[in-house]
């Protein structure tokens, strides 16, 4: 055994977490820092996210995939926008659909994944894992959207502009779209057609003038990327939001300096949602010296913990 070589490798002993009563989330996370596996990765994510949010020169991108809003994560994201911790939001259409549903006072309901889905269909109840919502909610949403589309300017619009107008028509301080519209934070949804918002836009366009340029957002988005001095990304899940954010740096002279990915997908199948941030370095999307980590766990568990711990640290600056 080469003891000198081993000493260079065996530098950081695992330190067991000590749990005491009345701990804050940040104190718990600091105990995680001495642990391995997911606990250690979560602690690293908090360290990186704190540094990213504390940096005034860093443009903060947030990728929102999956079904985070029906699961109850919208308040966290709206508050991050309101407090200046998200500069650019890229999302799936579904997240904004369910954000709008809630903003209209139409609730999602806790249900069960062990149920009779045929019975739910007969009762006109839709299921998202263990979340239920009535079909009637979509009828009400569609009526609202048709009214918004009827009031849009008769000029060519980007998808971002359409989402901003939807946000301006909402009256709910917990709404992501409303908060983003008020704070001037752009919300990009490259696959808006893949949602009820997009479907209703198409239905409206069948009988009325509606001019939406699906590529118009690219110019605005790339300008943000070119002008930023430093860039950081918090990625919930993968899919279109993750790729749209990371690919943007391919046409700029820089890469992301910070990157955090919260996912349950794995890299073996070659899909983007499971692709590691190390893999993104091979493309030049994430910088050679970037601070990055992937946390393999349910984002509805990890996001609140990370944000809570980081907010505690930010409040003590």
Swiss-Prot record:
Signal peptide: none annotated. Keywords: Hypusine biosynthesis, NAD, Transferase. Transmembrane segments: none annotated. The active site is at 285 (nucleophile). Catalyzes the NAD-dependent oxidative cleavage of spermidine and the subsequent transfer of the butylamine moiety of spermidine to the epsilon-amino group of a specific lysine residue of the eIF-5A precursor protein to form the intermediate deoxyhypusine residue. The gene is dys. This is Probable deoxyhypusine synthase. Belongs to the deoxyhypusine synthase family. One of its GO terms (molecular function) is deoxyhypusine synthase activity. Pathway: Protein modification; eIF5A hypusination. It comes from the Archaea.
């Amino acid at each position: 055994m080469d003891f000198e070589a081993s000493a260079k490798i065996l530098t950081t002993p695992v330190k067991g977490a000590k749990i005491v009563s009345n701990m804050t989330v940040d104190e718990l996370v600091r105990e995680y820092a001495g642990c391995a596996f997911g606990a250690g990765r979560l602690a690293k994510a908090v360290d990186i996210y704190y540094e990213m949010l504390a940096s005034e020169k860093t443009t903060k991108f947030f990728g929102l995939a999956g079904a985070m809003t029906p699961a109850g994560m919208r308040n966290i994201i709206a508050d991050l926008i309101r407090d200046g911790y998200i500069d650019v939001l890229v999302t799936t259409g579904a997240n904004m659909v369910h954000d709008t549903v809630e903003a209209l006072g139409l609730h999602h309901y806790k249900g069960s994944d062990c149920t009779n889905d045929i019975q739910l269909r007969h009762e006109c109840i839709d299921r998202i894992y263990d979340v239920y919502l009535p079909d009637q909610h979509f009828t009400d949403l569609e009526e609202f959207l048709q009214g918004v589309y009827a009031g849009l300017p008769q000029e060519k619009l980007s998808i971002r502009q359409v989402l901003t107008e939807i946000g301006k028509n909402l009256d709910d301080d917990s709404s992501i779209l409303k908060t983003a519209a008020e704070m001037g934070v752009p919300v990009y949804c490259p696959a808006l057609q893949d949602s009820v918002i997009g479907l209703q836009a198409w239905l409206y366009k069948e009988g009325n003038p509606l001019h939406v340029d699906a590529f118009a957002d690219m110019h605005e988005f790339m300008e943000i990327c070119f002008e930023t001095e430093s860039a950081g990304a918090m990625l919930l899940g993968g899919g279109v939001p993750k790729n749209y954010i990371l690919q943007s740096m391919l046409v700029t002279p820089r890469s992301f300096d910070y990157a955090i990915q919260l996912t349950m997908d794995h890299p073996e199948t070659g899909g983007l949602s499971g692709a590691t941030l190390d893999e993104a370095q091979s493309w030049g999307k994430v910088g050679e010296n970037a601070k990055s980590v992937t946390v393999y766990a349910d984002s509805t568990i990890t996001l609140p913990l990370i944000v809570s711990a980081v907010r505690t640290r930010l409040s003590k600056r």
